[in-house]
Protein backbone atom coordinates (compact mmCIF):
# COMPACT_ATOMS: atom_id res chain seq x y z
CA UNK A 1 0.00 0.00 0.00
CA UNK A 2 1.30 3.44 -0.90
CA UNK A 3 1.66 5.59 2.23
CA UNK A 4 3.05 9.11 1.88
CA UNK A 5 3.99 11.08 4.97
CA UNK A 6 4.39 14.57 3.54
CA UNK A 7 7.62 16.03 4.91
CA UNK A 8 7.41 19.44 3.25
CA UNK A 9 8.58 22.09 5.76
CA UNK A 10 5.33 24.06 5.52
CA UNK A 11 3.28 20.95 6.22
CA UNK A 12 5.42 20.01 9.20
CA UNK A 13 5.30 23.57 10.55
CA UNK A 14 1.52 23.76 10.30
CA UNK A 15 0.84 20.33 11.79
CA UNK A 16 3.04 21.36 14.70
CA UNK A 17 0.94 24.47 15.24
CA UNK A 18 -2.22 22.33 15.20
CA UNK A 19 -0.94 20.29 18.14
CA UNK A 20 -1.05 23.36 20.42
CA UNK A 21 -3.88 22.69 22.89
CA UNK A 22 -4.32 26.45 23.40
CA UNK A 23 -4.95 27.16 19.71
CA UNK A 24 -8.26 28.97 19.08
CA UNK A 25 -11.09 27.49 17.05
CA UNK A 26 -10.42 30.10 14.36
CA UNK A 27 -6.72 29.27 14.25
CA UNK A 28 -7.35 25.53 14.17
CA UNK A 29 -9.91 25.86 11.39
CA UNK A 30 -7.61 28.03 9.27
CA UNK A 31 -4.69 25.63 9.62
CA UNK A 32 -6.88 22.65 8.70
CA UNK A 33 -7.91 24.51 5.54
CA UNK A 34 -4.30 25.32 4.65
CA UNK A 35 -3.16 21.75 5.26
CA UNK A 36 -6.03 20.45 3.15
CA UNK A 37 -4.67 22.42 0.21
CA UNK A 38 -1.07 21.31 0.73
CA UNK A 39 -1.92 17.63 1.19
CA UNK A 40 -4.26 17.61 -1.80
CA UNK A 41 -1.44 19.04 -3.91
CA UNK A 42 0.67 16.00 -2.98
CA UNK A 43 -2.18 13.54 -3.45
CA UNK A 44 -2.92 14.75 -6.98
CA UNK A 45 0.68 14.71 -8.24
CA UNK A 46 0.15 11.46 -10.17
CA UNK A 47 -3.17 12.24 -11.86
CA UNK A 48 -3.34 11.33 -15.54
CA UNK A 49 -3.26 14.20 -18.03
CA UNK A 50 -4.08 14.48 -21.72
CA UNK A 51 -3.10 16.87 -24.48
CA UNK A 52 -5.54 19.53 -25.60
CA UNK A 53 -5.19 22.16 -28.32
CA UNK A 54 -6.72 25.54 -27.57
CA UNK A 55 -6.49 29.08 -28.96
CA UNK A 56 -3.49 31.03 -27.70
CA UNK A 57 -2.51 34.66 -28.11
CA UNK A 58 -0.15 33.72 -30.97
CA UNK A 59 -2.23 30.90 -32.43
CA UNK A 60 -3.18 27.35 -31.39
CA UNK A 61 -1.24 26.00 -28.41
CA UNK A 62 -1.05 22.47 -27.02
CA UNK A 63 -1.61 22.24 -23.26
CA UNK A 64 -2.10 19.52 -20.66
CA UNK A 65 -5.39 18.97 -18.84
CA UNK A 66 -6.49 16.50 -16.20
CA UNK A 67 -7.86 13.45 -18.02
CA UNK A 68 -11.19 11.79 -17.41
CA UNK A 69 -14.18 12.74 -15.30
CA UNK A 70 -14.01 15.36 -12.55
CA UNK A 71 -12.45 14.32 -9.26
CA UNK A 72 -14.85 13.69 -6.38
CA UNK A 73 -13.98 14.74 -2.85
CA UNK A 74 -15.43 12.60 -0.07
CA UNK A 75 -15.45 14.36 3.31
CA UNK A 76 -16.46 12.09 6.17
CA UNK A 77 -18.89 13.85 8.51
CA UNK A 78 -18.34 15.86 10.43
CA UNK A 79 -14.64 16.61 10.79
CA UNK A 80 -13.90 15.95 7.12
CA UNK A 81 -15.90 19.06 6.25
CA UNK A 82 -13.15 21.15 7.82
CA UNK A 83 -10.70 20.03 5.13
CA UNK A 84 -13.11 20.60 2.25
CA UNK A 85 -12.59 24.37 1.66
CA UNK A 86 -8.83 23.98 1.34
CA UNK A 87 -9.09 21.13 -1.15
CA UNK A 88 -11.79 22.90 -3.16
CA UNK A 89 -9.52 25.95 -3.37
CA UNK A 90 -7.09 23.73 -5.27
CA UNK A 91 -9.68 21.72 -7.23
CA UNK A 92 -12.69 24.06 -7.57
CA UNK A 93 -14.43 21.95 -10.22
CA UNK A 94 -14.43 18.80 -8.08
CA UNK A 95 -17.67 17.02 -7.30
CA UNK A 96 -18.41 16.50 -3.61
CA UNK A 97 -19.69 13.20 -2.23
CA UNK A 98 -20.59 13.27 1.48
CA UNK A 99 -20.78 10.28 3.83
CA UNK A 100 -21.62 9.98 7.51
CA UNK A 101 -21.09 6.94 9.71
CA UNK A 102 -21.77 6.14 13.34
CA UNK A 103 -20.94 3.19 15.55
CA UNK A 104 -23.55 0.51 16.15
CA UNK A 105 -23.70 0.13 19.94
CA UNK A 106 -24.28 -3.63 19.70
CA UNK A 107 -21.78 -4.64 17.03
CA UNK A 108 -19.42 -1.66 17.57
CA UNK A 109 -19.07 -1.49 13.79
CA UNK A 110 -19.46 1.75 11.80
CA UNK A 111 -22.75 1.96 9.91
CA UNK A 112 -23.74 4.70 7.43
CA UNK A 113 -26.42 7.21 8.40
CA UNK A 114 -25.86 9.59 5.46
CA UNK A 115 -24.69 8.92 1.91
CA UNK A 116 -24.76 11.27 -1.08
CA UNK A 117 -22.38 10.07 -3.78
CA UNK A 118 -21.85 11.63 -7.17
CA UNK A 119 -22.45 9.54 -10.26
CA UNK A 120 -19.95 7.81 -12.56
CA UNK A 121 -17.64 6.95 -9.69
CA UNK A 122 -15.97 4.30 -11.81
CA UNK A 123 -14.57 7.12 -13.98
CA UNK A 124 -13.39 9.38 -11.16
CA UNK A 125 -10.53 9.67 -8.72
CA UNK A 126 -12.06 9.78 -5.22
CA UNK A 127 -10.22 11.67 -2.47
CA UNK A 128 -11.46 10.84 1.03
CA UNK A 129 -11.02 13.68 3.52
CA UNK A 130 -10.78 13.08 7.27
CA UNK A 131 -8.43 14.77 9.75
CA UNK A 132 -7.77 11.57 11.71
CA UNK A 133 -7.05 7.99 10.71
CA UNK A 134 -7.24 6.17 14.04
CA UNK A 135 -8.46 2.55 14.13
CA UNK A 136 -9.35 2.66 10.44
CA UNK A 137 -12.89 1.36 10.96
CA UNK A 138 -14.69 4.41 9.59
CA UNK A 139 -12.29 4.72 6.67
CA UNK A 140 -12.64 1.06 5.71
CA UNK A 141 -16.44 1.33 5.81
CA UNK A 142 -16.28 4.44 3.61
CA UNK A 143 -14.04 2.70 1.09
CA UNK A 144 -16.38 -0.31 1.08
CA UNK A 145 -19.25 2.06 0.29
CA UNK A 146 -17.35 3.78 -2.52
CA UNK A 147 -16.25 0.52 -4.11
CA UNK A 148 -19.80 -0.85 -4.03
CA UNK A 149 -20.82 2.30 -5.92
CA UNK A 150 -18.15 1.66 -8.56
CA UNK A 151 -15.12 3.67 -7.40
CA UNK A 152 -11.81 2.17 -8.49
CA UNK A 153 -9.22 4.88 -7.79
CA UNK A 154 -9.37 5.93 -4.16
CA UNK A 155 -6.98 7.99 -2.04
CA UNK A 156 -7.23 9.12 1.56
CA UNK A 157 -5.99 12.48 2.86
CA UNK A 158 -5.45 12.83 6.61
CA UNK A 159 -3.79 15.29 8.96
CA UNK A 160 -2.54 12.55 11.28
CA UNK A 161 -2.62 8.75 11.06
CA UNK A 162 -2.01 5.98 13.58
CA UNK A 163 0.08 2.93 12.67
CA UNK A 164 -2.75 0.67 13.82
CA UNK A 165 -5.18 2.25 11.37
CA UNK A 166 -2.71 2.04 8.51
CA UNK A 167 -2.14 -1.65 9.21
CA UNK A 168 -5.88 -2.35 9.34
CA UNK A 169 -6.42 -0.50 6.06
CA UNK A 170 -3.61 -2.32 4.27
CA UNK A 171 -5.08 -5.68 5.29
CA UNK A 172 -8.34 -5.06 3.39
CA UNK A 173 -7.70 -2.25 0.88
CA UNK A 174 -4.02 -2.34 -0.15
CA UNK A 175 -4.86 -0.55 -3.40
CA UNK A 176 -5.82 2.69 -1.61
CA UNK A 177 -3.19 5.43 -1.39
CA UNK A 178 -2.73 7.37 1.87
CA UNK A 179 -1.40 10.92 2.23
CA UNK A 180 -0.86 12.34 5.70
CA UNK A 181 1.01 15.15 7.40
CA UNK A 182 2.13 12.86 10.22
CA UNK A 183 2.19 9.21 11.24
CA UNK A 184 1.84 9.40 15.00
CA UNK A 185 3.02 6.98 17.68
CA UNK A 186 0.05 4.83 18.65
CA UNK A 187 -3.56 4.65 19.86
CA UNK A 188 -4.33 4.75 23.57
CA UNK A 189 -6.73 2.37 25.29
CA UNK A 190 -9.69 4.53 24.22
CA UNK A 191 -8.65 4.57 20.57
CA UNK A 192 -7.34 8.14 20.54
CA UNK A 193 -4.24 8.99 18.50
CA UNK A 194 -1.17 9.98 20.50
CA UNK A 195 0.20 12.60 20.40
CA UNK A 196 -2.65 13.46 18.02
CA UNK A 197 -4.67 16.65 17.80
CA UNK A 198 -7.46 16.04 20.28
CA UNK A 199 -11.00 15.80 18.91
CA UNK A 200 -10.59 17.40 15.49
CA UNK A 201 -14.33 17.80 14.96
CA UNK A 202 -14.80 19.66 18.22
CA UNK A 203 -11.78 21.85 17.54
CA UNK A 204 -12.94 22.71 14.01
CA UNK A 205 -16.54 23.47 14.96
CA UNK A 206 -15.92 24.97 18.39
CA UNK A 207 -17.96 22.40 20.30
CA UNK A 208 -15.33 21.20 22.73
CA UNK A 209 -15.98 21.67 26.44
CA UNK A 210 -13.89 24.52 27.81
Swiss-Prot record:
Entry-linked InterPro entries: PRibTrfase_dom, PRTase-like, Upp_B, UPRTase/APRTase, Ura_phspho_trans
UniProt catalytic activity: UMP + diphosphate = 5-phospho-alpha-D-ribose 1-diphosphate + uracil
Cofactor binding notes: Binds 1 Mg(2+) ion per subunit. The magnesium is bound as Mg-PRPP.
GO biological process entries: UMP salvage; uracil salvage
Residues engaged in binding uracil: 193, 198-200
Binding site for 5-phospho-alpha-D-ribose 1-diphosphate: 78, 103, 130-138, 199
Activity control note: Allosterically activated by GTP.
Record's keyword terms, sorted: Allosteric enzyme, Glycosyltransferase, GTP-binding, Magnesium, Nucleotide-binding, Transferase
Molecular function as annotated in GO: adenine phosphoribosyltransferase activity; GTP binding; magnesium ion binding; uracil phosphoribosyltransferase activity
Chain's role: Catalyzes the conversion of uracil and 5-phospho-alpha-D-ribose 1-diphosphate (PRPP) to UMP and diphosphate.
Name of the molecule in the record: Uracil phosphoribosyltransferase
Species whose genome carries this gene: Xanthomonas campestris pv. campestris (strain ATCC 33913 / DSM 3586 / NCPPB 528 / LMG 568 / P 25)
Amino acid sequence: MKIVEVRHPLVQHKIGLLRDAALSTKGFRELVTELGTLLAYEATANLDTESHVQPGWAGPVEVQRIAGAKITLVPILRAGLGMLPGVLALIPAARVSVVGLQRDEETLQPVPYFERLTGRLEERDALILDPMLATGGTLIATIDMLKRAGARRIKGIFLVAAPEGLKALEAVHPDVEVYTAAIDDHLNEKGYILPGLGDAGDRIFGTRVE
